[in-house]
Amino acid sequence: MSANTTTESFDCVVVGGGPAGTTAAQRLAQEGRSVLLLDKPGKIKPCGGAIPPKAINDFNIPDSQLVCKVAGARVISPKGRNVDMPIDDGFVGMVDRKDFDPWLRNRAALMGASYREGAYQGLERGTDGVPVLSYRPMGPEDGRNAPEVKVRAHMVIGA
């Protein structure tokens, strides 16, 4: 692939718009890097949604994103035995990932990252050695018939 067959170039492409990917995209954008955040729409991984107070503070997560604050947990075995576990630091904030993840992606975009919905297709090196990532845009349609898009990126993060 020649270096001029793609129209866009980014310092970094982050594949995956969950908490890790959006945090990476946001931090890089805040540092002035050009960032593309690519995420496949409509896919939320199974997750309990628990966020400890230190992470809430460190990542500036507003109370509006918390569904509730939990002060303890109980595990019940198949035989009916209970184990109660108090939570250190008083509580754990709970989020609903179907609302929380889009909020994180929007925050990364507000900080300067470009956000696109699409399905990762592959990664290769251009003739100049710079990685070229390909993806299929997705949105109202499922993306199967969308033409593949190729972008250059000096760094790719799989999140």
Residues covered by each model-derived region:
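Beta1/beta-strand and adjacent pyrophosphate-binding region of the FAD-binding site
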Residues: 4-18
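Predominantly flavin-linked oxidoreductase catalytic cores and closely associated redox partners
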Residues: 17, 27, 31, 107-159
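N-terminal Rossmann-fold NAD(P) dinucleotide-binding loop
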Residues: 21
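A conserved beta-strand/loop capping segment in the N-terminal third of enzymes
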Residues: 54-110, 117-118, 122-125
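N-terminal beta-loop-helix "entrance" segment that forms/cooperates
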Residues: 47-53
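Glycine-rich FAD pyrophosphate-binding loop
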Residues: 13, 17, 26-47
